[in-house]
Amino acid sequence: TFSNTLQCHNVAGNWNFAIELLAEHAGPRVVGLIGAVRAPEIGYMFNASYWGHGYATEALRGFMPLFFGHYSGRDIADYAGRDCKEERNGVRVNGSTAKAPLAPRYDYAEAHTDTELVPSQNVLTKVGFKFHEKREKDFENPVLGLRDTLIFRMYRPAGEGWP
């Protein structure tokens, strides 16, 4: 499954994963990253060689239930990589009975994209994100200067299977 292809990476409150392309004839290959960069803001990036193959859509579809599960107000150990062997916020998460701190609850996820990154906007809308707002000249790109940003949001779905 998709969640089995993710490798846990948790630094200073971020919740990020490597995306691996698994091939029968070769070992895993990291092709991108996905995660909560500043929750509730999510983000993803891929090696340009893998653009246009549906990997971003597949990864985001797999990640969003994990995002809402992790940021549900429940114990972090319930969702934060039970198989990872490191400690997070001083709490061991590999089966320890120590009480983990609560993850904050977010009822939406937000993605920021440049107005010209139409393929990324298409990925977001395919997965269920909706346009929320346009922010003018709010991001400074070192090469392109001040840029406008489009904000897309996905709200926590109600119903079974969603924490």
For the regions a language model picked out, list residue spans one by one.
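A short helix-loop-beta-strand connector motif used in the catalytic cores of GNAT acetyltransferases and
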Residues: 2-18, 32
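Acyl-donor (CoA/ACP) binding surface of acyl/acetyltransferases
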Residues: 16-163
